[in-house]
Each structure stands twice: as structure tokens, then as C-alpha cells.
């Protein structure tokens, strides 16, 4: 029930921030103490645990959430942005200003993101990442990781928290 409440109160903002993974020099990430099999850090107390996509059942119960897609952090570092990509960055940083959307019980943040991008004709490219059993967002609005510096990439936030696992 707590998870349903969190989903009902979902406030999602996507931000272009940095992301990096430690490695062992052979292309395989190292597992740190406390990390799960997908190399994610423990989920803080009171936050929802990730759910394996293959274990989800989408129900009939509908909820609403607010979703937005922001690349505002690029505005502070435009000098790092590829010249060809600079024109794709909105002056106010919003690719999608906050909008309320409806989703069904069991749908993931990724499901909602796909729906909203499709409805708003906003380009989004992703790949499924078997090692993490989740979707990796490669680009939104034709802005991709590394387009604005070597540590740039897409992250998501739910209820003011950046989950350390894929959407």
C-alpha cells in the first residue's frame, strides 16, 4: 500500500546531471559492499524498492502524477555543450514543463516517461540494460549523454529523491 501511495504522489523530474560507474579496468564494474546484484547502493529507509520488470502486473486502478523533463543544468554549462546540440537546449531549460498524467497501478517511471514522450511528440531513445535489468535513457529531445560534457547524462527524480536504479 505504501508503494501505491508513493506512486499516487509521484512527482517526477528528469534532469541532465552526471553519472559514473566504478570499474575494475576490464570493463566490468566492481561490486561494492552493500550493493545488490545490479551494483546499486541500498535503498534508503522509507523509499520504494525496485521491482523487477518481469514481476510486474499492471492493474486497472488509475493514479495521477506530475511529470516534467528538464535540462536546466545544461544552461549553467553551455560551454561544455556540443555546438550542434546547443540549439536544442530550450532557453528556459524545459523540454516538457510539469504536466499531470494518468497511469495504472504497476506501471513504472519508464512506462510513464514513454507515454508522455509519445503523447508530446518528444524524441526519446533508450536501451534495455540486461546487467541492471532496466531501461537506460540514452537521449531525450535529441540530447544524449556526453553531448554536454563527459559526465552528462539523464537521471530521474521521484518525490525529490534520485533512485540509484534504472527507471
Positions of predicted regions on the chain:
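Ubiquitin-like/PB1-type beta-grasp interaction modules and other compact soluble beta-rich domains
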Residues: 2-9, 18-167
